[in-house]
Amino acid sequence: MDNLSLTFENMGVRLPYSMDAEQAVLGAALLQGDCIPTLVEKLRPEHFFARQNGEIFAELVRLFTGGAAIDFVTVLNAVVSAGTFATSDEAKVYLTGLAETVPSISNVEYYANIVYEKYLVRQLMAAAKDILEQTAEEPDADILLESAEQKIYEI
């Protein structure tokens, strides 16, 4: 669990994410690799809340841009080689689950939008945390406002 998660968990607030949407994006890409260019326009690995989902996405993109076939075997080999999972069996179970639980491949852009929106909210929460911490250290309101504007603008 990262520092941001711990901070908000201590306040009784959970960081927003949709595991279903993350897994639907990955499952759709696994089943129909030609949707990857559409996904790359919207998502990056760091947009995924679950570390392993981001790593799987990175491998899918790497395979696709390298001209490799996107199928169960190539993706399995890639994520095992990348160390995303502790064992090959663990990777097989997870990837099989992704492929079996995709609600609809045709909705992959919608799922990608959900993943991206949750990421943006997490980024806003991180900026809010930074701004709050800075207010305890910086008494000058103009400096605080400028810093806060910059943090929001960067998102």
Question: For the regions a protein language model found, what residue spans apply to each?
Answer:
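Interdomain "pre-motor" coupling segment immediately N-terminal to P-loop NTPase/helicase cores
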Residues: 97-155
